[in-house]
């Protein structure tokens, strides 16, 4: 059995990790930490997991947690993961960081967007960006997994098959993204209380969202471009729903390139052939967030708009599962040589 600990287990991504790992046949949960709920039974914090988890929340004792676990999941705000990652590396333990501290490979870019100094820039080069459909071989050999952000997951799955194919302007993408409120975390925040969110849709962090450089970094790598030359427009919106992300990517075709929708769809199906969680839809079938609710599955719809010379790609995922905790477990499965779908194979909850 793989002994797993979750640091920051009482936020939404931490709770989703607990829910999924509690029924993972190859995992034993050995530690759940929480600053707010230390010493309280976990099921008191999340009663829906009564009978599933009999552990109490612990304080964040870095030596104790890293000693007893084979893999440590970090579900912490940015700026807090570095000491945990450094200790896991020192002790030869695997670590999957669901935060932002190791996603960006250049410390200067991280510091520009997150406004904190990176305390272990020497570890950035070792961290593997954990999007399994794109980085599976690197993940297999990794010690540090930087679990992607929720918006970048959906955005990159949308555009990856077209990158480097000579078909589109990868540096000029436009990404419109919509997310459920759980993406904002579990905290007392006026912007996400019921009266503010219900029957309301709003854009936020326009032209300054921290997932923008993450998307640009990975698109540039796949397309063989300079990340500093990227000019991707990314605009997120908050939706009056609990879970789900829907991204729509607009990609300009290069001059003289005129593929049909069917040709592009075949390219996507070849690219994702054999991927258990990726589903490329038929022409005219557009993904819905309800399809992926509670699951690790991603649904992709696309068309070529010949009139404007663009490819339009829409992708739906669950922000807490494929966009966070499910993908983290998918990465763990790869790290330990397990079937990739173990513990996360279930379809979404519908309706």
From Swiss-Prot:
Superkingdom classification of source: Bacteria
PROSITE patterns listed in its UniProt record: ARGC (PS01224)
Keywords for this protein: Amino-acid biosynthesis, Arginine biosynthesis, Cytoplasm, NADP, Oxidoreductase
One record GO biological process: L-arginine biosynthetic process
GO CC terms in record: cytoplasm
Residue positions of the active site: 150
GO MF, one annotated term: N-acetyl-gamma-glutamyl-phosphate reductase activity
Location of the protein in the cell: Cytoplasm
Enzyme class: oxidoreductase
The keyword Amino-acid biosynthesis is annotated on this UniProt entry: yes
Pathway: Amino-acid biosynthesis; L-arginine biosynthesis; N(2)-acetyl-L-ornithine from L-glutamate: step 3/4
Family: Belongs to the NAGSA dehydrogenase family. Type 1 subfamily.
Role this protein plays: Catalyzes the NADPH-dependent reduction of N-acetyl-5-glutamyl phosphate to yield N-acetyl-L-glutamate 5-semialdehyde.
UniProt xrefs under NCBIfam families: argC
Name listed for the protein in its UniProt record: N-acetyl-gamma-glutamyl-phosphate reductase
This protein's encoding gene: argC
């Amino acid at each position: 059995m793989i002994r797993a600990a979750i640091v920051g287990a009482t936020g939404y991504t931490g709770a989703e990790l607990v829910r999924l790992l509690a029924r993972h046949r190859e995992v034993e949960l050995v530690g759940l930490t929480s600053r707010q709920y230390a010493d309280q039974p976990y099921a008191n914090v999340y009663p829906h997991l009564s009978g599933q988890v009999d552990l109490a929340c612990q304080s964040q004792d870095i030596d104790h947690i890293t000693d007893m676990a084979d893999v440590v999941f970090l579900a912490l705000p940015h700026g807090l993961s570095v000491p945990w990652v450094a200790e896991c590396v020192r002790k030869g333990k695997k670590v999957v960081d669901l935060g932002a501290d190791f996603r960006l490979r250049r410390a200067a870019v991280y510091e520009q967007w997150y406004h904190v100094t990176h305390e272990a820039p020497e570890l950035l080069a070792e961290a593997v960006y954990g999007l399994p459909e794109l980085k599976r071989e690197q993940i297999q050999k990794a010690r540090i997994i930087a679990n992607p952000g929720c918006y970048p997951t959906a955005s990159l799955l949308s555009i990856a098959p077209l990158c480097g194919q000579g078909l589109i302007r990868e540096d000029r993408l436009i990404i419109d993204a919509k997310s459920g409120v759980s993406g904002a975390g579990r905290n007392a925040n006026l912007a996400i209380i019921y009266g503010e969110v219900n029957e309301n849709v709003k854009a936020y962090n326009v032209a300054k969202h921290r997932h923008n450089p993450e998307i640009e970094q990975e698109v540039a790598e796949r397309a063989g471009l300079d990340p500093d030359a990227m000019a991707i427009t990314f605009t997120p919106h908050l939706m009056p729903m609990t879970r789900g992300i829907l991204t729509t990517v607009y990609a300009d075709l290069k001059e003289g390139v005129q593929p049909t929708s069917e040709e592009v769809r075949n390219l996507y199906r070849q690219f994702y052939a054999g991927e258990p969680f990726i589903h490329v839809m038929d022409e005219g079938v557009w993904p819905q967030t309800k399809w992926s609710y509670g699951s690790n599955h991603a649904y992709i719809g696309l068309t070529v708009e010949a009139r404007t010379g663009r490819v339009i790609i829409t992708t739906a995922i669950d922000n807490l599962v494929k966009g966070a905790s499910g993908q983290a477990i998918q990465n763990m499965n790869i790290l330990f040589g397990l079937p990739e779908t173990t513990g996360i194979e279930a379809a979404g909850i519908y309706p």
